[in-house]
Amino acid sequence: MITPPDVFKSLSDETRARATLLIASLGELCVCELMCALNDSQPKISRHLAQLRSNGMLLDRRQGQWVYYRLNPELPSWVHEMLQVTLQANSQWLADNALRLKNMDGRPVRDSVCC
């Protein structure tokens, strides 16, 4: 079971916090979408996602050569609630990331090829 210190430690890095909130907002994102939204390299994004996955915050699924990430549905309800409150109270903090993602060329359609 994930504890409050585990959650807050996971979200203490800005890249992990932004990625987690974007995933919480949109349901599921692949590495290439997060690269675009966060304007970061694939190795950096993948490293942070691996950390979030290893501590139980995220689950992944492979579709061909692409990996998609989503919140772990077995997280305690307080984690989901905290993420939703954070999203609602801080939409401006993620506005640039959301805009980059919205304007992404070749954005993947689920169940098809990414990027």
Curated annotation (Swiss-Prot):
Keywords from the UniProt entry: Arsenical resistance, Cytoplasm, DNA-binding, Metal-binding, Metal-thiolate cluster, Transcription, Transcription regulation
Biological process, per Gene Ontology: response to arsenic-containing substance
Main location: cytoplasm
Highest taxon listed in the record's lineage: Bacteria
Subcellular location field: Cytoplasm
Protein residues bound to arsenite: C30, C32
Cited function: Binds arsenite and regulates the expression of arsenic efflux pumps. In vitro, also binds antimony and bismuth, but not arsenate.
Protein name: Arsenic resistance transcriptional regulator ArsR2
Native source organism of the sequence: Pseudomonas putida (strain ATCC 47054 / DSM 6125 / CFBP 8728 / NCIMB 11950 / KT2440)
Lineage of the species this protein comes from: Bacteria, Pseudomonadati, Pseudomonadota, Gammaproteobacteria, Pseudomonadales
Gene this protein is translated from: arsR2
